[in-house]
């Protein structure tokens, strides 16, 4: 999974604000990094794999690489994957058996880990509109929105897996219900796993302090879990209309969370698995560090985070993450 997060990082670095000369030079290096990592990944991994999160997350990064580089082989790779999966997540057509607890079989249609694929399908639709590409995405999400339940996003990963699906489909359909349900579902998530004092998310309700503690008695915030959220908020803000009534809610959440994450960065530039207790699981949590970097860079580049404050954070963790790419560093 490390390649996924390096790709997200590389795409974010590719739009760093710099002087013209530095920007041109850096762009060449970033694209070299993207191509070496991504082309190696695609050469070693068939696109004909399931649409569950473990593969679908990669395609969110692959599409960002395509948008940045224009490399048609990247787009083709994701289209092959989408066609292999019939532009679906979980494939059950019997709504009576659709579930959203954890599961990997075809009845888990409403589970966010089987909805992240809709992000890539929507990206591909926007490049070449064809209703078949988002037919299933709309069927699933619009059925979900028609139900009275609002507890679909019960674990932090869902805020990357499913939350951006709502804004992407809103941009296609202009159906305001996507935004209102997005807000409603996030409010529920906040009610069960958000720590208002720390501005961070627990992995899920089982990890709430003080019911759950680290071995040293501290709050246990999982780096990749919070990184999913920060990156997910960045993706939502990218598509969320500024005139939307709850837009400032999302801005505040993104900014407050970025501040909280930056404050507990390790001196070496990374975040540990349990962010407030480095001794609980020492050493870098690379996937979380990469996704945090993506979120920080997106926020800087789009005016949501102050460059003077957050670029030093990025410069610290950038070295740590890029040093973890053995393929690139071998050249």
Where are these regions (language model features)?
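Positions within ordered alpha-helical repeat solenoids
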Residues: 64, 123, 143-146, 168, ...
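Asp-box/WD-like beta-propeller blade repeats and closely related beta-sheet repeat scaffolds
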Residues: 130-166
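CBM-like carbohydrate-recognition segments
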Residues: 23-56, 64-112, 118-120, 124-127, ...
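Bacterial Sec-dependent N-terminal signal peptides
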Residues: 1-25
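Amphipathic, well-ordered alpha-helical segments in soluble domains
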Residues: 54, 61, 81, 113-116, ...
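Helix-capping and short linker residues that terminate individual alpha-solenoid repeat units
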Residues: 42, 46, 70, 86-91, ...
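Extended ligand-binding clefts on enzyme/binding-domain cores
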Residues: 157, 167-275, 281-293, 305-331
């Amino acid at each position: 999974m490390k390649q996924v997060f390096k790709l997200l990082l590389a795409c974010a670095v590719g739009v760093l604000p710099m002087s013209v000369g530095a920007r041109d030079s850096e762009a060449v290096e970033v694209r070299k990094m993207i191509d070496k990592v991504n082309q190696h990944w695609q050469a070693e991994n068939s696109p004909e794999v399931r649409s569950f999160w473990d593969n679908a997350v990669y395609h969110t990064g692959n599409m960002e690489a395509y948008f940045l580089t224009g490399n048609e082989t990247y787009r083709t790779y994701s289209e092959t994957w989408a066609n292999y999966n019939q532009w679906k997540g979980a494939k059950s057509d019997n709504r009576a058996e659709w579930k959203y607890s954890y599961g990997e079989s075809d009845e888990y249609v409403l589970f966010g880990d089987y909805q992240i694929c809709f992000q890539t399908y929507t990206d591909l639709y926007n490049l070449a509109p064809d209703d078949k590409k988002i037919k299933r995405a709309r069927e699933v999400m619009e059925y979900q929105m028609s139900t009275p339940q609002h507890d679909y996003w019960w674990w932090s990963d869902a805020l990357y897996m499913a939350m951006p699906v709502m804004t992407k489909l809103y941009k296609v359909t202009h159906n305001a219900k996507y935004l209102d349900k997005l807000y409603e579902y996030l409010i529920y998530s906040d009610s069960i796993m958000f720590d208002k004092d720390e501005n961070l998310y627990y992995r899920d309700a089982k990890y709430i302090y003080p019911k759950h503690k680290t071995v040293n008695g501290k709050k246990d915030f999982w780096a990749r879990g919070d990184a999913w959220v920060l990156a997910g908020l960045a993706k939502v803000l990218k598509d969320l209309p500024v005139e939307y009534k709850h837009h400032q809610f999302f801005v505040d959440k993104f900014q407050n969370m970025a501040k909280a994450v930056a404050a507990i960065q390790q001196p070496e530039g990374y975040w540990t698995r349990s962010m407030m207790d480095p001794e609980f699981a020492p050493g870098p949590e690379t996937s979380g560090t990469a996704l945090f970097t993506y979120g920080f860079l997106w926020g800087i580049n789009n005016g949501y985070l102050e460059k003077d404050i957050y670029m030093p954070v990025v410069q610290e963790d950038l070295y740590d993450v890029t040093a973890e790419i053995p393929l690139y560093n071998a050249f």
